[in-house]
């Protein structure tokens, strides 16, 4: 196996429980969206996001009320729309900064990320959530501030997560051959795309025992990845 020089990790279902995203973050943003838009409609960033949402939704001349209904409909559909992601990220930022929200990170993931960072591995995040939201979840986590572990964050602006070209672009951005990058995710479609780009990849399956390591390869946790591959460790 080619030596690993960098690790790219997904968030939802990989470093973070699915329930945190769907049962904590999404409802938190939904409950506060109307008040946030009303209070910040004149903010340049918010106004731009609302305008982008209208254009994307085909309601260019709509007011804030109709735009709000569009955004709520996108939430119901779990649509990965850029303007929605930006607004959610801004709402979450307030929650994190006020101490109301804490990013939930699996303890094994936090321990491995710190170990790998200390070992000199370059660490990156690739998630459908916005870059800002990614920084918040790791920077204000229940495992402490993991932000210093990461060199960079990628969201869907670099491409779809099931498109192999996205992974090639991430490796190119890092200045590394894809074969020297290890990608971790719970999503088989993403794993397939990463491998098609030439990356090494391991499926994280949280339904398995923590130390499980199976053909695929598939691991029950980050600690299982460390035990099986010891990425970045000198021979």
From Swiss-Prot:
Keywords: Amino-acid biosynthesis, Hydrolase, Magnesium, Metal-binding, Methionine biosynthesis. Pfam families: Hydrolase. Binds 1 Mg(2+) ion per subunit. It comes from the Bacteria. Its EC number is 3.1.3.77. It catalyses: 5-methylsulfanyl-2,3-dioxopentyl phosphate + H2O = 1,2-dihydroxy-5-(methylsulfanyl)pent-1-en-3-one + phosphate. Its cofactor is Mg(2+). Pathway: Amino-acid biosynthesis; L-methionine biosynthesis via salvage pathway; L-methionine from S-methyl-5-thio-alpha-D-ribose 1-phosphate: step 3/6; Amino-acid biosynthesis; L-methionine biosynthesis via salvage pathway; L-methionine from S-methyl-5-thio-alpha-D-ribose 1-phosphate: step 4/6. InterPro entries: Enolase-ppase_E1, HAD-like_sf, HAD-SF_hydro_IA, HAD_sf. CDD domains: HAD_EP. It is an enzyme of class 3 (hydrolase). Disulfide bonds: none annotated. One of its GO terms (biological process) is L-methionine salvage from methylthioadenosine. One of its GO terms (molecular function) is magnesium ion binding. HAMAP family: Salvage_MtnC (MF_01681). Bifunctional enzyme that catalyzes the enolization of 2,3-diketo-5-methylthiopentyl-1-phosphate (DK-MTP-1-P) into the intermediate 2-hydroxy-3-keto-5-methylthiopentenyl-1-phosphate (HK-MTPenyl-1-P), which is then dephosphorylated to form the acireductone 1,2-dihydroxy-3-keto-5-methylthiopentene (DHK-MTPene). Monomer. Belongs to the HAD-like hydrolase superfamily. MasA/MtnC family. This is Enolase-phosphatase E1. The gene is mtnC.
